[in-house]
């Protein structure tokens, strides 16, 4: 399946890309929303500016949006717009994200995917922390 990856540049979003590729999926683009600050409820913030370099290294196109506030509605709208663009430009059928335990994030991402008629893949959801660290190492 052709996928977009919600990409913060952290280990979880990066490893989720690796996992879905192992499953046979094709990651067509990275979707990154740059929150205004670390106060975001939905999005990862530390070192997110490095995602542009990671995109080049991974050889996967990146589409981005930069926000003026950390309001949840603005973050959700930005993701919706980027996923519509990814669907149009890359013919994606689904979204992968690296969420592990946040029910709040999972529900938000599921809602956005449902509104965009996209499947959602969460290869790290509820993974045992010890097993996960062993996989990474």
Features from the language model and the residues they span:
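ATP-dependent adenylation/nucleotidyltransferase module used to activate substrates
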Residues: 1-137
């Amino acid at each position: 399946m052709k996928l977009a990856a919600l990409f913060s540049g952290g280990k979880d979003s990066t490893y989720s890309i690796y996992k879905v590729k192992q499953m046979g999926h094709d990651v067509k683009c990275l979707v990154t929303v740059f929150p205004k600050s670390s106060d975001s409820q939905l999005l990862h913030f530390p070192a997110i500016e490095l995602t542009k370099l990671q995109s080049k290294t991974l050889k996967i196109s990146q589409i981005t949006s930069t926000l003026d506030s950390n309001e949840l509605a603005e973050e959700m709208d930005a993701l919706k717009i980027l996923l519509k663009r990814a669907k149009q430009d890359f013919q994606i059928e689904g979204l992968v994200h690296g969420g592990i335990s946040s029910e709040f994030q999972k529900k938000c991402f599921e809602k956005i995917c449902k509104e965009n008629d996209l499947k959602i893949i969460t290869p790290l959801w509820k993974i045992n922390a010890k097993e996960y660290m062993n996989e990474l190492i």
